[in-house]
């Protein structure tokens, strides 16, 4: 039984979606004013991995992830670049889709945009005003935070603590408009030159928090099975979403809240962020690092834990992924000389590997324990293919199991599986030299033939074995 750590209750809970076999999941997407950095991508990859495991477990996942395409940051960035806010949004939405595709992130079922839902946002706000949860003030509309009985529950903060924090961050202009420092904006009156829409309260634009309430409930209903995002969104964004949504619908907004840990960088383990200027964009990094390696690096740390970003971590991820790909390739190669037949022992072993993988992942998507099982499967596969005589059916079964389990982490072992790089060639040459030293000429010939089939010609010389790539 899958258990998920619910931020709202601060404990692991058995996962029971509202509708058997179907999961409605909403993940807060990016504000599209720049390229996403590794910290942003952590959330994307973490919850894509959660989605993949849910699908592996047999669920149909309705996955909605939004684009915030209008807010203060968007307006500022558009002005700096000398383009309109819609032009800025288009530019970085395209970049986001390209970068996440490179990381093998499955497209969301729906990618709604705030600017495409203005009518729904206005209607939502009107309903909150009618119910007494919101009020107009000087062209702005604010939510009455204290009126919502459970305000602060998600983040575990008292109203007194929240009031102190809010008072420190409220501008003089806002103090004049708000009835309470805790109140937050649902609609903002337009300033000269800003993008705007007509509304019952005058020209303006939506606040950030209301956008997600409107888009999530529009596509997934009043109650979501899972709502996810970074830990930094817990307050105020997700706290405010709950207040808005439950005040309007009268129903519980979310059954399971999931929040991912940060990516840290440097000796002091600082959180990676644009505001600190210590970020590395995915757009730039994938020009230097294999996107599959970056994906594997991020998807093999449990989503609630922080990730320390470093070159050493990427090198380690690359080595581990290379071992998995080599194993997959070796299985494919041994199919050529495999005999027909089955092996009940192998099937039982594979069933055990799968059961242990599921047990690990069912524990709040514990990918670290899950990948440990995959590495055990890899060692088992390598031991099997090193036998002199192998059977076709067990090899196919091992290969399929390895591919399916690794796919949960967003990596396709079949991609470029037939390609061979210099590192792998040298590894096989060393293995062949060891076989020759032990007078295992059958294995030596097998490795030579394997390389030749992939266009690599070996030449044994007094100075050692050299290789060249066969010309077409």
Swiss-Prot record:
InterPro entries: Cys-tRNA-ligase, Cys-tRNA-synt_Ia_DALR, Cys-tRNA/MSH_ligase, CysS_C, Rossmann-like_a/b/a_fold, tRNA-synt_1_cat_dom, tRNAsynth_Ia_anticodon-bd. Zn(2+) binds at residues 28, 212, 237, 241. Keywords: Aminoacyl-tRNA synthetase, ATP-binding, Cytoplasm, Ligase, Metal-binding, Nucleotide-binding, Protein biosynthesis, Zinc. One of its GO terms (molecular function) is cysteine-tRNA ligase activity. A motif ('HIGH' region) lies at residues 30-40. It holds the Pfam family CysS_C. Its main location: cytoplasm. Binds 1 zinc ion per subunit. GO terms for biological process: cysteinyl-tRNA aminoacylation. It comes from the Bacteria. One of its GO terms (cellular component) is cytosol. ATP binds at residue 274. It is found in: Cytoplasm. The keyword Aminoacyl-tRNA synthetase applies. It catalyses: tRNA(Cys) + L-cysteine + ATP = L-cysteinyl-tRNA(Cys) + AMP + diphosphate. Its EC number is 6.1.1.16. A motif ('KMSKS' region) lies at residues 271-275. Its cofactor is Zn(2+). The keyword Ligase applies. Monomer. Belongs to the class-I aminoacyl-tRNA synthetase family. This is Cysteine--tRNA ligase. It comes from Limosilactobacillus fermentum (strain NBRC 3956 / LMG 18251) (Lactobacillus fermentum). The lineage of its organism: Bacteria, Bacillati, Bacillota, Bacilli, Lactobacillales.
């Amino acid at each position: 039984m899958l258990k998920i750590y619910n931020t709202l209750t601060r404990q692991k809970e058995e996962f029971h979606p509202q509708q058997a076999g179907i999961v409605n999941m909403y993940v807060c997407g990016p504000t599209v004013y720049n390229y996403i950095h590794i910290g942003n991508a952590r959330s994307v990859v973490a919850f894509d991995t959660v989605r993949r495991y849910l699908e592996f477990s047999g669920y149909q996942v309705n996955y909605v992830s939004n684009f915030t395409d209008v807010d203060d940051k968007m307006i500022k960035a558009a002005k700096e670049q000398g383009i309109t806010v819609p032009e800025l949004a288009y530019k970085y939405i395209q970049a986001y889709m390209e970068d996440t595709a490179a990381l093998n992130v499955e497209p969301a079922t729906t990618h709604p945009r705030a600017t495409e839902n203005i009518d729904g946002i206005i209607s939502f706000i009107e309903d909150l005003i009618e119910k007494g949860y919101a009020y107009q003030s000087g062209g702005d509309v604010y939510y009455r935070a204290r009126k919502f009985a459970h305000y602060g529950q998600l983040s575990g903060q008292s109203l007194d603590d929240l009031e102190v924090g809010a008072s420190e961050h409220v501008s003089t202009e806002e103090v004049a408009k708000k009835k309470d420092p805790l109140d937050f904006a649902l609609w903002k009156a337009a300033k000269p030159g800003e993008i705007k829409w007509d509304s019952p309260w005058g020209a303006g634009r939506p606040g950030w928090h209301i956008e997600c309430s409107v888009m999530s409930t529009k596509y997934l209903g009043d109650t979501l099975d899972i709502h996810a995002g970074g830990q930094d969104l817990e307050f105020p964004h997700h706290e405010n979403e709950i207040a808005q949504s439950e005040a309007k619908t009268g129903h519980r907004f979310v059954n399971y809240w999931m929040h991912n840990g940060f990516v840290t960088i440097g000796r002091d383990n600082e959180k990676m962020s644009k505001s600190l200027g210590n970020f590395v964009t995915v757009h730039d990094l994938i020009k230097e690092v294999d996107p599959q390696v970056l994906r594997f690096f991020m998807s093999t740390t449990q989503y609630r834990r922080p990730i320390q970003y470093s070159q050493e971590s990427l090198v380690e991820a690359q080595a581990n992924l290379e071992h998995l790909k080599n194993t997959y390739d070796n299985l494919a190669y041994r199919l050529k000389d495999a005999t027909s037949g089955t092996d009940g022992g192998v099937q039982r072993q594979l069933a055990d590997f799968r059961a242990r993988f599921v047990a690990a992942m069912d524990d709040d998507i514990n990918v670290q324990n899950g990948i440990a099982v995959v590495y055990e499967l890899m060692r088992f596969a390598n031991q099997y293919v090193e036998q002199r005589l192998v059977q076709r059916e067990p090899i196919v079964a091992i290969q399929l199991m390895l591919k399916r389990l690794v796919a949960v982490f967003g990596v396709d072992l079949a991609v470029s599986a037939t390609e061979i790089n210099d590192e792998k060639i040298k590894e096989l040459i060393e293995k062949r030299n060891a076989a020759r030293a032990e007078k295992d000429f059958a294995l030596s010939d097998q490795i030579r033939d394997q390389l030749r089939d992939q266009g690599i010609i070996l030449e044994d010389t007094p100075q050692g074995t050299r290789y060249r790539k066969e010309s077409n």
